[in-house]
């Protein structure tokens, strides 16, 4: 960890709406601002029948890959494992395409892993706020900033209660991969966020949370933002139950 100070931010994407692409533009811009504070890279993998996302920033720190994938279901966990293997950093940040976080919170979460205080580290305290369409648009137009959003968070919907585990997290790459990485049995949208935390808990691996909220930009809820069908929903829920019932030795 000491010899490799780079942090890799990895983002799998399937563009299912104009808002999704616009949100990712803003997320990339925000992450690029971290260059002033840490050695970093951003790796984006787009998986779809045809490419729909075009980077707006040309920079040696950003790498984009396109994978042809005609499946209607976006196998996010599979692509995350590929991105983690390709990542150059000893710390990997796994980011959704639509989340914004204050810079200080991201750096706090990185520092917890660097100091050996965590294997998994969240850059927020569990409060996951859904921004309305109007404020999301103001942010993208630069007519509102993160600080102003954070000042009015109590006007926003707290999506998953006060202890969310989705949106963004960082891991010690080698340790996380050693203990399974992402669970590819989750196919499409499902409870993989809860599963990975439960797995860390069973294994006795430390998890850290930075203080402060996460902001989620508006986008339409399309197929890959919800369970694809009843069969997939059942299979994904049963996978979570299976893992949650395991012992450390079984994992």
Give the label of every model feature segment.
Residues 1-30:
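N-proximal low-complexity "stem/linker" segments adjacent to membrane-targeting elements
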Residues 102-184:
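Conserved catalytic core of nucleotide-sugar-dependent glycosyltransferases
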Residues 28-69:
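Acidic donor-binding segment of Leloir-type glycosyltransferases
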Residues 89-100:
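Short beta-strand-to-loop acidic/aromatic patch adjacent to the donor-nucleotide binding site
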Residues 20-23, 163-164, 184-251:
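C-terminal catalytic/acceptor-binding lobe
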Residues 70-86:
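Glycine-rich, basic loop-to-helix element that forms the pyrophosphate-binding segment
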Residues 6-10, 41, 195:
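Cell-envelope/extracellular polymer assembly enzymes that use nucleotide-activated donors
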Residues 87-90, 181:
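Active-site acidic short loop of glycosyltransferases
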């Amino acid at each position: 960890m000491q010899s490799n100070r780079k942090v890799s931010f990895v983002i799998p994407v399937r563009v299912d709406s104009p808002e999704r692409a616009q949100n990712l533009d803003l997320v990339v811009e925000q992450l690029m601002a971290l260059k002033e504070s840490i050695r970093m890279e951003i790796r984006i993998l787009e998986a779809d029948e045809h490419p729909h996302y075009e980077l707006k920033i040309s920079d040696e720190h950003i790498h984009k890959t396109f994978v042809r994938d005609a499946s209607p279901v976006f196998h996010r966990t599979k692509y995350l494992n590929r991105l983690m293997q390709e990542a150059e950093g000893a710390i990997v940040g796994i980011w959704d395409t639509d989340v914004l976080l204050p810079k200080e919170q991201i750096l706090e979460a990185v520092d917890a892993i660097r100091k050996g205080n965590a294997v998994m580290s969240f850059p927020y305290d569990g409060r996951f706020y859904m921004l309305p369409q109007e404020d999301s648009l103001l942010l993208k137009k630069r007519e509102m900033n993160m600080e102003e959003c954070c000042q009015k968070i109590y006007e926003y919907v707290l999506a998953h209660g006060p202890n969310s585990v989705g949106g963004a997290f960082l891991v010690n790459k080698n340790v996380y991969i050693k203990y399974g990485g992402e669970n590819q049995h989750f196919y499409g949208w499902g409870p993989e966020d809860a599963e990975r935390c439960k797995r860390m808990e069973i294994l006795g691996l430390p998890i850290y949370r930075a203080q402060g909220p996460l902001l989620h930009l508006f986008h339409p809820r399309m197929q890959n933002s919800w369970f694809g069908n009843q069969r997939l929903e059942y299979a994904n829920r049963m996978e979570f139950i299976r893992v949650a019932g395991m012992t450390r030795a079984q994992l």
